[in-house]
Amino acid sequence: MDILERTFKKLTRLKDNLQDLSQEEAYEVFRAILEGKLSDIKTTAFLTAMRIKGETSEELLGVIKAIKERMNFPQKKEDALDLGLNYDGKNRTIYILPSALWLCSRLGVEFTNHYALGAPTKEGVTLYEVVKELGVDMNVSFVDQKNYAPELYKLMPLRRELGFRSLINTVEKFLNPFQTKKIVVSIFHKPYFDKNAELLELLGIEDYTIIKGLEGGIEPLPDRPTLVKKRGKDIESIEPKSLGLEMPKDVHSENVLRDSLEINRKIIDGRERGEFFNWALYTAGVLLYAAGECESVEEGVGRVEKEST
């Protein structure tokens, strides 16, 4: 029995008897998927079984190794902060991240982001789309998944057809094609803090920050506490009221791209200095903290605010 047969046998049991895979087994299965050696039916079975079982950090690491072996790496940007955002974007709330990036860029902070358009399950608006339409330099480098990981990108139609968040939604945030030393990643649920921290340690990332933000992203929630975990520290609860800044009460949107462009253009042009500008300051403070440019979010907000006056 070869490793693929043995691995699938582990994943074709009843739910209570599903067995975790070794890092090597996860690597071999996903390598076979990327090489087109597994049918869509077997690929679907693998992704579904892993979804039901729940992935371990070792399994995710094996999948990442299989992907990275076949990646096309752009120019290395070791000192930048990689924005490991959920690839499926946003479909319910306004982006404030572009204004925050613009504010941080004035302090010389560099960012990277990798993305794919139309990624499941939300198939929402990506940061890239908003920044591209704004046409303003924010010191951020982008790379499309279809260019840096074409074999992975070929799975997109199957992922859309499946219609659920698979392990690919998790691992693609950690691929770090620009090979930065610093990463900030987003999560949807609090239990993922520990698993993501363990995975980042296994990947050897020198400095990482994990954020449970708006729509599972890295933007801090304007109306309630945001949970943040920095490497080597406990989970922090950042309360917007503690910053002494009035935040917007409602950031929902029926047209994310249109409304995001409108708000961010006003901030960048200097026409908005109210609640949304304050939210941009808050988000920029979080980014500076994640980039290791300050010791706390509060300090980061103060630095950005001083630069903006």
Curated annotation (Swiss-Prot):
InterPro entries named among the record's database cross-references: Anthranilate_Pribosyl_Tfrase (IPR005940), Glycosyl_Trfase_fam3 (IPR000312), Glycosyl_Trfase_fam3_N_dom (IPR017459), Glycosyl_Trfase_fam3_N_dom_sf (IPR036320), Nuc_phospho_transferase (IPR035902)
Keywords: Glycosyltransferase, Transferase
Pfam families reported in the protein's UniProt record: Glycos_trans_3N, Glycos_transf_3
Disulfide bridge map: none
Record carries keyword Transport: no
Any GO BP: L-tryptophan biosynthetic process
GO molecular function per UniProt: anthranilate phosphoribosyltransferase activity
Gene Ontology, cellular component aspect: cytosol
Superkingdom of source: Bacteria
UniProt family annotation: Belongs to the anthranilate phosphoribosyltransferase family.
PANTHER family referenced in this protein's UniProt entry, alphabetically: ANTHRANILATE PHOSPHORIBOSYLTRANSFERASE
Identification of the protein by name: Uncharacterized protein aq_209
Organism listed in the record: Aquifex aeolicus (strain VF5)
